[in-house]
Amino acid sequence: MNELEFKDWCREQQLATHTIDLIAQIRESPPSRRVQGRTKNVCGVYPSSKMGVTIQFESHTVELWAIYLMEHDPQVLEFYDQPPPFKIQYKNQAGRNIGHYHTPDFFVLRHDGACWEEWKTVKELEKLAQKYPGRYQNTASGHWRCPPGEAHASQFGLKYCVRTDAELNPVFTQNLMFLSDYLGFKSNLTTDVTHSVLAYLKANPGITIAALLQELNDVCANDIYIMIATELLYVDLSAVPLVEHYRTRLWVSQQNHDAYTHASVVSVTTKNTPSSPTTLLPNTALEWDSALWTLVNYGETTTTLLPESGFPIQLPTVFFLQLFDSGTIKIHNGVTDATINETVRTLMETASPVHLKEANRKFNIVQAYFQRHTDIYQDINPRTLRRWVQQFREAEASLGCGYVGLLPRTHQQGNRQPKSPTDSSELLDKFIKEHFETPRQATGASVYRAYVRACTALNIQPLSNRTFYQRLKKRPTHEQTLKRQGAKAAYATEPFVWELALNTRPHGNRPLEIVHIDHTELDIELRSLATGRLLGRPWLTLLTDAYSRRILAVYLTFDAPSYRSCMMGLRILVQRQGRFPSTLVVDGGKEFHSIYFDTLLARYHCTKKTRPGGKPRFGSVIERLFGTTNTEFIYNLLGNTQASKQPRQLTKTVDPKQLAVWNLGDLYTYLTQWAYSIYDSNYHDSLGASPDVVYTEGLSIAGERLHRRIAYNEEFLMATRPSTPKGQAKVQPGYGIKVNYLYYWSDAFRNPNVEKTLVPVRYDPFDMGVAYAYVDGRWVRCISQYYSTFVGRTEKEVLLAAQEIRQLNKRSATATNLNAKHLADFIANVQEHEALLLQRLRDLESKRLLDNLTSSNSSDPSVNQVHSTFAVLAQQSEDVTSQHVPSRNVEPLDLSSLPILAEYK
């Protein structure tokens, strides 16, 4: 709402002045806090088109679903996350007064009023209601309320609502997420397709999507979704997921759907058909003439019934149905026998296969005794036979099932009561809890010795060493590891969380719905192509599609994870796929939580989800892929670091640093070929097909969504370029703008109206020779003050030089302002600084990859010839090596003469 619409809304609600001021303050204020995920919560931000800002959520299954509902609810005018906190007071379970500041999840403005909303699961509310009965209460109607919050809201004539996950329909929410690319975005649809679909639906109302696509060859799933989003077709979004084409029914309008649905319900209720085929199943308990019978077989011609005692009988099915329809035979209500049935069920569940086999043998003999087949039980002792018959009849009379009376009772024999002294046993348990299960991680032998000393001091008999270790083994493994070694060590034994309720799929319903991004340091040592010098291990950035497990982007660099790696990963993704993911799953790394990164995701309507720290199972898709990359590719190359993981067994013959032959460019070439071709076409056990096949089929089912394609052009590249922490720079007359200690100039700065004004700025972290400024409604290219020195230099190299200068000034106790000339002079003498030289070598290796990515239109970048810059740098490297490291005698390697491994020919 704009200011005029807000005033009209306040006038309609007849709000008091202080209430209007409060709402205005909430509307103008940023979120009062930044959400953080707890141990099992996935938090993140959602780019709201309705609000024009990003909305935070602390739970991706409750709060995020609520955001989706409010985003598409026409009754919701505005909603704000994390509004300003207010103080609440209540009593806890012990009756103690508690007061603290509380921040609700949302403040929502609707057509009929405004309210604070707190969203939680029912299970969580039940626990909180026991702990804080004065704060959360469950009403008789099943609704939850918060009296302290309501008391605060009543002061302003507003409401405070406690909302639960029970109000969220998983299927409806899932369909909203599925249609998010079509809601609010323009999409092209020809009139011929619209007319053909509507005409066919009028003739065949309620047809499924699968049947419609099979009949109309010129219509695809993408067209159907566009018509649903634009309300040209009606689908009950709360019925079934849209991706299930064989179940999703289409209608011309909601009125048409309601009319056919009502007619079908009436026809079913009025149709006089016997209900027996759907209600009568084998082992169904029936009541006939006050006697209990069991339905053994319900056949087409005859039906077999078994009485409580006696022999089974057979009735013609037609006659049986007449008795059933007339009510003479009816289904037995087992409510009164719930206790008996529960006892029988417990006895049957606890019986072992050996016991069941023995009971079956006894049952056959007892049945032969009832039927007077003496030849079957003639070898059985008469006294034993009478005992079995008695056990059968007693169980039949008391439990209604004589079979359980024949189950062996050998497991109940013997004295099962504990024989150890109570004092000794309790003291042993105490020592295990207080001395063994502690972060001290004391050994079992030392704890047992302390236990024996304590028993001697108390003059009681200690339990044996064997009993002590048996008690240790019976303790829960997860809890014991948690107390001794901490949460990370115990995470491996933590039980899995199984989704048993109807929920959204954890890996999405379509390709590019959920994409994981993460970094890892590859287990391989690399050399410089120019000098043969060891450069260390590279960092790998991967983006993978959770739905199809397809690798979407691969990026290699020597730099530690930063926003530069994130930017390049997203650039490669858009270059190869032409799409931006709907949801990006990240970890807690600081490179994923910068303002620049969040702005980039919001710009392309991407929801960011943050995995809980120390819980790798939340990112199992990409964590497993890192392991696959190592085992299937990296570990087959020379210079892999498997041997160095056991340093005590490392020798020169297997030292990865001695065996290293790969350079960054060659490794990237073959790594992309493996990721985009080999892995992509291999069979995946979890999918039952290859990632490429699943990805392609997923696009055909979920729609290509061509209207959401992103062009890999200068506009996109500019959006991926970072800005400074301030975001703006002042145009200094004659100098231009200053970015990262450097001045940049453009002829656009000659305009007097631009001088001494703040303009938005961006820069290329891989080329500090240029920067960009937003002047007169367009981005202009600016040249560095010392362009010849800084062109091709990365941001990290310049910042490293600045750090070196600060360190030198600190040692000499001098204070020198960092400026472009000082930095240029310092970098020009790079041969005297090995740290800068190594960074330069790494940056030049990475520069080759960037040139390939920007110049090649193919998916698999190729390795170009070495530039002349490497020859100059090789001479500098030899000088540095001879001056600083004379003992190494590293000779340049001619990698072009090295043999290529057979598997990559």
Predicted ranges, named:
Residues M1-Y68, H72-C115, W119-F156, Y160-V171, ...:
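Secondary-structure boundary/capping micro-motif
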Residues N175:
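Conserved tryptophan-centered aromatic signature that marks the ligand-binding surface of SH3
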